[in-house]
Amino acid sequence: GSEMCIRDRYESKGYIEPFEKFNVHPSSYIQGIGDTIGEWRRKALDNLRNLELVKSESYLNIMEEGLGILNELDYPDALTGGLRRYADNARGIIERTRSEFCTILNKQMSLTNTAVKEKTLAIVKKYPINVKQ
């Protein structure tokens, strides 16, 4: 469905294509974005487990971009099949992912390995979040 198309196109092109590029009803696109955010969370967490912080960050960023798209869409709720619910759910998923990302960054910052600390600091500086430096 839409989730697979959105995800696959992102994986091949590196960005979320606009609604007009898909031959689907607006509610299918919205549902696809919402569902794909959950899939990107899984990928972000998989990369976190492997300490692939840059890859994990890229999935967090695309999740936020997906939420931005959901927030920009302005269709009546009857057409969208519950846009607000999808946006609220996506927001919660992103906040949990960001929290887990910050937890790992904090753990990495506590390491004595200078190379790891420098790499982690470069990521930390991008986020206006509560990460101990």
Predicted regions and their residues:
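Long amphipathic alpha-helical coiled-coil segments
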Residues: 23, 55-61, 111-119
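Charged/polar, solvent-exposed surface patches and flexible loops
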Residues: 46, 58, 65, 72, ...
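C-terminal accessory extensions/subdomains outside the catalytic/core fold
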Residues: 82-133
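Short, charged/polar, low-complexity loop and linker segments
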Residues: 10-22, 40-42
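Surface-exposed interaction/gating patches
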Residues: 25-59, 63-66, 70
